[in-house]
C-alpha cells in the first residue's frame, strides 16, 4: 500500500511540473552573427576569444607605431620645402628691380634670364653661364663670317684657343675681333662716300645729310646715342677722330687697315 501511495504522489508531482514548466531555447542554437547586433560593443568584445582580442590589440599598436614615423617624415619634408620656397622668394625679391629694368631695356635678354633657374650650367657656375650668354650674342656674326670667309673663320677659331685674352675673357676677345672686321669696311665706306657713311651711323641726323664737314666737327662735342648703345661703334668713332691726321687713311686705305687699331685698347 505504501509503495502504491508513493508512486501516485510521484506521478502527481511530475504532472504538476509538466503543466507549469516553460520552454527555454538554448543559446548555442542561435547564430553567432545575431548576438553583436543586440549587445553593446563592450559586451560583444567580452564574448570574443582571448586570442582574438590579443590579435586585435597587437594590430592596433602596430598601426599606430608605423603611422607615427611616416607622419614625422612628411612633416619634415613639408618643412624643408617651405624653407626652400622662402629662400627662393627672398632671392627673387633681391633681383626683381634689376630684372624689371632689364625687361624694359631688353626684353629678349630678360626672357633668357628667366630661364636661368632651369639651366644646369647656370646653377653650377654663374660666371660661365654669363660668358655663354655673351658669346651667344656674337654667334650670328661668327656664323656669317664662316659662310663668307671660311678660312678667316678657322683662323679666328685657332686664335681663340691660343690667345690668353680669349681664354681669360672670351667676350672681350670676340668684340675686338669683330671690331677688326667691321672697321675696314666702315673705313672704306668713309673714304669712298662720307655722306653714306654718316647716314649709316646716324640715319636720323639731318646735319649729316646737309653738311658732313660740320657734322664731323660737331660729333666731337655731342653725345652719340648709337655709340652709347653699341660699344663697337663707340670704339670706331674714337678711332675715326684720328682720321684727318692720318695720311695713309686718305692716300692708301689698305695701309690704313694694316695699322694697329687704337679702338681695341679701350677694352
From Swiss-Prot:
Keyword annotations: Seed storage protein, Signal, Storage protein
Keyword Signal: yes
GO molecular function terms attached to this record: nutrient reservoir activity
Pfam name, any one: Zein
Keyword Signal: yes
Disulfide bond residue pairs: none
InterPro entries per the UniProt record, alphabetical: Maize_Zein_Storage, Zein
Signal sequence, start to end: 1-21
Family listed: Belongs to the zein family.
Further facts: The alpha zeins of 19 kDa and 22 kDa account for 70% of the total zein fraction. They are encoded by a large multigene family.
Record function comment: Zeins are major seed storage proteins.
Protein name: 22 kDa alpha-zein 14
Primary gene name: AZS22-14
Amino acid at each position: 500500500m505504501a509503495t502504491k501511495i508513493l508512486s501516485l504522489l510521484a506521478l502527481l508531482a511530475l504532472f504538476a511540473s509538466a503543466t507549469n514548466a516553460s520552454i527555454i531555447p538554448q543559446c548555442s542554437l542561435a547564430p553567432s552573427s545575431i548576438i553583436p547586433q543586440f549587445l553593446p560593443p563592450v559586451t560583444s568584445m567580452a564574448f570574443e576569444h582571448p586570442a582574438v582580442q590579443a590579435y586585435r590589440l597587437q594590430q592596433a599598436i602596430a598601426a599606430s607605431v608605423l603611422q607615427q614615423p611616416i607622419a614625422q617624415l612628411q612633416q619634415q619634408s613639408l618643412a624643408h620645402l617651405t624653407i626652400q620656397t622662402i629662400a627662393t622668394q627672398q632671392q627673387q625679391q633681391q633681383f626683381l628691380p634689376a630684372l624689371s629694368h632689364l625687361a624694359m631695356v631688353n626684353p629678349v635678354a630678360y626672357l633668357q634670364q628667366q630661364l636661368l633657374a632651369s639651366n644646369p650650367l647656370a646653377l653650377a657656375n654663374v660666371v660661365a653661364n654669363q660668358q655663354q650668354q655673351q658669346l651667344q650674342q656674337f654667334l650670328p656674326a661668327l656664323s656669317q663670317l664662316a659662310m663668307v670667309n671660311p678660312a678667316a673663320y678657322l683662323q679666328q677659331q685657332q686664335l681663340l684657343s691660343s690667345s690668353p685674352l680669349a681664354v681669360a675673357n672670351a667676350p672681350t676677345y670676340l668684340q675686338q675681333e669683330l671690331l677688326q672686321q667691321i672697321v675696314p669696311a666702315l673705313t672704306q665706306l668713309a673714304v669712298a662716300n662720307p655722306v653714306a657713311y654718316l647716314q649709316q651711323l646716324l640715319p636720323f641726323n639731318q646735319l649729316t645729310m646737309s653738311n658732313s664737314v660740320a657734322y664731323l666737327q660737331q660729333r666731337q662735342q655731342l653725345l652719340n646715342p648709337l655709340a652709347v648703345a653699341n660699344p663697337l661703334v663707340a670704339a670706331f668713332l674714337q678711332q675715326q677722330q684720328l682720321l684727318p691726321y692720318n695720311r695713309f687713311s686718305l692716300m692708301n686705305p689698305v695701309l690704313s687697315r694694316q695699322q694697329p687699331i687704337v679702338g681695341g685698347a679701350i677694352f
